[in-house]
C-alpha cells in the first residue's frame, strides 16, 4: 500500500487518544531507532513509567519459576486472600520488548477489577528466545503454580490467560497448547485478548492502517515475526497462526477486544467470526477512536479503563 493511500489515522482518533499521542515526557530521551535492542528495551521501560503511576496498591509477591530453559520471573498480584481464580498475564511488546514493569498498572487494575490473583510471567524475549520457547515457559509456569498452589496460597482450580498484542497471541496459544497436549493446570475459565495478532499474513486493516505512531507498518510486523520465529515453517504452526489450530471445539470462553485504528484489528474480527461460527463461547468488543496499545493509557483514557473492566467482568462471569 502506497503510504499516501492509508487512512489519516491521527486525524480520526478520539479526543482522549489524541491527548495521549500529544503527551510529552520532558525528561525522556528520543526513541533510539537505530540503537541496539537492549537500548530500545531500556527506553520502553523508561517511557512506560509515567503511564504506570498511580496503580492500586495490593499484596505483591515475586517468584522465580523453573523451566527447561532456566528460571523465569513471575509476579503475583493478590487483591484479596480468597481469590476465586488465578489469571496469568502475558505482556505485549512485539515479542521483543516489555516486561513485568512495563505492564504493571494493567495487571494491578485487572486484579483489582476481577478480584482474582493475577500472575505476570516474564517470558524470555526474542530474538534471544525463539518460538515456541515463550509458550513452553508460560505452560511450565502454569504447571508449577498448579503443583505448588497450596504452598503459594493461590486458587488454581480455575485459571485464565490474558494478554495484549503479542501477549494476546501467547495467551490463546498457551490455552490451546494445554488443551491439545492434555495438560491439566486447572479449568481454563476464560481468555482475555486485547488487540492481538493471531496469524493473518495480510488484511484490509493491515493495508489501511499502521504507521510511525504505532510501530505497526508491514515492515515492523515482519521484523517482529522474524525475531520471534525459528524458521519459515513456523509461520504455519497452529501455535503461531492460530487459525491453523482447531477452533471448532473446546476453546475456552474468549473476550476479544479490538482497537478501531489498529492494523491488527482484522485478526481479532476473524478470530471472533471463526469462534462464533462454530458455537465457541466468545465476545467481541470494538473500542472506537483507539490506537493499538491503548490499554496502557488508563491514567488518561476512560476507554482504556473501560476495556480492562470489560475484560475483568467477562472473566468473573465465567466463574
UniProtKB/Swiss-Prot annotation:
GO terms for cellular component: cytoplasm. It comes from the Bacteria. Keywords: Cytoplasm, Hydrolase, Serine esterase. It is found in: Cytoplasm. The keyword Cytoplasm applies. The active site is at residues 165, 262, 292. The keyword Cytoplasm applies. Its EC number is 3.1.1.-. Homodimer. Interacts with MalT and MelA. Displays esterase activity towards short chain fatty esters (acyl chain length of up to 8 carbons). Able to hydrolyze triacetylglycerol (triacetin) and tributyrylglycerol (tributyrin), but not trioleylglycerol (triolein) or cholesterol oleate. Negatively regulates MalT activity by antagonizing maltotriose binding. Inhibits MelA galactosidase activity. This is Acetyl esterase. It comes from Shigella flexneri serotype 5b (strain 8401).
Amino acid at each position: 500500500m502506497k503510504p499516501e493511500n492509508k487512512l489519516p489515522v491521527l486525524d480520526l482518533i478520539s479526543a482522549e487518544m489524541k491527548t495521549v499521542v500529544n503527551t510529552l515526557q520532558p525528561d525522556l530521551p528520543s526513541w533510539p531507532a537505530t540503537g541496539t535492542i537492549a537500548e530500545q528495551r531500556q527506553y520502553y521501560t523508561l517511557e512506560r513509567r509515567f503511564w504506570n503511576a498511580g496503580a492500586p496498591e495490593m499484596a505483591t509477591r515475586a517468584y522465580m519459576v523453573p523451566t527447561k530453559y532456566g528460571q523465569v520471573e513471575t509476579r503475583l498480584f493478590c487483591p484479596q486472600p480468597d481469590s476465586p481464580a488465578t489469571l496469568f498475564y502475558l505482556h505485549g511488546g512485539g515479542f521483543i520488548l516489555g516486561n513485568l514493569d512495563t505492564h504493571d498498572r494493567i495487571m494491578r487494575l485487572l486484579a483489582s477489577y476481577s478480584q482474582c490473583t493475577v500472575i505476570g510471567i516474564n517470558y524470555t524475549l526474542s530474538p534471544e528466545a525463539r518460538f515456541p520457547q515463550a509458550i513452553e515457559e508460560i505452560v511450565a509456569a502454569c504447571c508449577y503454580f498448579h503443583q505448588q498452589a497450596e504452598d503459594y496460597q493461590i486458587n488454581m482450580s480455575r485459571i485464565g490467560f490474558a494478554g495484549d498484542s503479542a501477549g494476546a497471541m501467547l495467551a490463546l496459544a498457551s490455552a490451546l497448547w494445554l488443551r491439545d497436549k492434555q495438560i491439566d493446570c486447572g479449568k481454563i475459565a476464560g481468555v482475555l485478548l486485547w488487540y492481538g495478532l493471531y496469524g493473518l499474513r495480510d488484511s484490509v486493516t493491515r493495508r489501511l492502517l499502521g504507521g510511525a505512531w504505532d510501530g505497526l507498518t508491514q515492515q515492523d510486523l515482519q521484523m517482529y515475526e522474524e525475531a520471534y520465529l525459528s524458521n519459515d515453517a513456523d509461520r504455519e504452526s497452529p501455535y503461531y497462526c492460530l487459525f491453523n489450530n482447531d477452533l471448532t471445539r473446546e476453546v475456552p470462553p474468549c473476550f476479544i477486544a479490538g482497537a478501531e485504528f489498529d492494523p491488527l484489528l482484522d485478526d481479532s474480527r476473524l478470530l471472533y467470526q471463526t469462534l462464533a461460527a462454530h458455537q465457541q463461547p466468545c465476545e467481541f468488543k470494538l473500542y472506537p477512536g483507539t490506537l493499538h496499545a491503548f490499554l496502557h493509557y488508563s491514567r488518561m483514557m476512560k476507554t482504556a479503563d473501560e476495556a480492562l473492566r470489560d475484560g475483568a467482568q467477562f472473566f468473573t462471569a465465567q466463574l
